[in-house]
Structure formats: structure tokens, C-alpha cells
């Protein structure tokens, strides 16, 4: 988030008449509930799936459906007069993690619970073979700027838990009136079942190489 934000900050101070610019700022994808954010069999009841996150009892994080993400990108190019000079922060919903099990149960009929853990506890789920490995496989080498998976994703969770995320929901509704507006709606539309399915190439490549 920091590295991309620095690029966006640099772009945002450019003269938008001499160089028309727009920034599309996203968040985690709802589809990552199939992968990095997928539920696991609960330790107390293997028949129940546990959605695990270090967000506290009522913490939330923004998620966006990839289908709508592409439509927002198309809007940026189709409406240059409105999008010029705009950093459009998009999301489908500010998702309270403790509410996901109820949405999942309603969409699938399956039992689920929310488990709040520490950031270190989240890494103990084994999502990354080595959480302390440097993140950025395409970089030519470690120049002192690369961060570990623990630093990178730990920063994500701490920022979201802080409650400082702000979105212009009215603008997103105006741009895309038929957008997906809740994780429950996305689950029903995508026939989500809680099973792990590949999404991010880099994520699976790293697990294969480990």
C-alpha cells in the first residue's frame, strides 16, 4: 500500500491539464475469500468453517468484487472529464468480519464462525511458507526497500482494524448503480461454497516453490 501510494501521491501533484491523470485505488478482492481469506475447519468443530482475521470483535475491512472493479476502471476511461484528477477509491462493502458467518450461512446453509486472532496468530495458519521472507519476487535484489510478508500483510490488518478507512459510497453508487453491495450478495451471485480455489498466480507459485 505504501509503495503504490507514493506513486499515486506523485501523480496527484502533476498538472492535470498538461497531463490528464486518474488513479483507481482498490482493496482486497471478495474473491480472495476463495484463497488467502478462505475459511478453515474450526478447531472446536471440524464440521464448522471458521473465518479467521486479526480484526477484533467488530473490526472491518473493505472488499471489492472483481467484476465491479473492472467496471470502475472502464468508467475512468469512458468519462475523462470527470475522472481527470480523481483518485477513485473503490470497494463493494466495508465488511465486518464477525458478520461474514451469518452471510455465509444464509447463502450456503453451512455453519460458520468468526475467530479473532492476533496478527502473528493469523500467520500461524500457514498461508505463507515463510512469513519472514522478503515480499517482491520480481525485484532484481533486496535493495533495503523490500518488506517481509509479515510486515506487508501485518500492516494491512492493523490499518483496517484502526477504523480509518473512508469511502465515498454515494459516488460509487452513482458510477455503478447495479454494483454488488454486500459480501452476502457476492456469495449468492458467485455460488460461493467456502472451498479454496486458485485466484492469485503469485500466491500459488510461492506455495509451489516452497
Name every feature range the model reports, one short phrase each:
Residues 39, 159-162, 206:
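Surface-exposed polar/charged interaction patches
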Residues 70, 101, 123, 184-187:
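Generic structural signal for individual residues within well-ordered alpha-helical segments
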Residues 167-210:
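Amphipathic terminal alpha-helices
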Residues 1-111:
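Oxidoreductase cofactor-interface core, primarily capturing Rossmann-like NAD(P)-dependent enzymes
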Residues 49-52, 125, 164-167:
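Surface-exposed beta-strand-to-loop junctions
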Residues 88, 101-161:
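Terminal hydrophobic/aromatic helix or amphipathic segment near a protein terminus
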Residues 14, 76-80, 107, 153-163, ...:
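Generic recognition of well-structured, leucine-rich alpha-helical segments
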Amino acid at each position: 500500500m505504501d509503495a503504490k501510494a507514493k506513486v499515486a501521491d506523485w501523480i496527484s501533484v502533476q498538472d492535470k491539464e498538461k497531463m490528464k491523470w486518474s488513479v483507481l485505488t482498490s482493496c482486497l478482492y471478495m474473491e480472495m475469500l476463495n484463497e488467502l481469506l478462505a475459511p478453515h475447519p474450526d478447531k472446536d468443530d471440524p464440521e464448522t468453517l471458521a473465518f479467521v482475521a486479526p480484526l477484533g470483535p467488530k473490526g472491518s475491512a473493505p472488499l471489492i468484487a472483481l467484476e465491479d472493479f473492472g467496471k470502475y476502471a472502464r468508467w475512468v476511461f469512458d468519462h475523462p472529464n470527470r475522472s481527470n484528477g480523481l483518485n477513485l477509491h473503490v470497494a463493494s462493502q466495508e465488511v465486518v468480519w464477525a458478520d461474514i458467518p451469518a452471510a455465509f450461512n444464509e447463502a450456503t446453509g453451512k455453519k460458520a464462525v468468526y475467530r479473532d486472532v492476533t496478527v502473528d496468530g493469523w500467520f500461524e495458519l500457514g498461508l505463507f511458507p515463510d512469513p519472514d521472507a522478503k515480499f517482491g519476487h520480481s525485484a532484481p535484489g533486496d535493495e533495503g526497500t523490500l518488506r517481509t510478508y509479515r510486515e506487508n500483510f501485518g500492516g494491512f490488518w492493523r490499518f483496517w482494524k484502526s477504523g480509518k478507512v473512508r469511502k465515498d459510497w454515494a459516488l460509487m453508487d452513482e458510477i455503478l448503480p447495479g454494483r454488488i453491495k454486500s459480501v452476502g450478495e457476492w456469495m449468492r451471485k458467485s455460488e460461493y461454497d467456502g472451498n479454496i480455489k486458485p485466484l492469485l498466480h503469485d500466491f500459488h507459485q510461492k506455495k509451489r516453490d516452497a
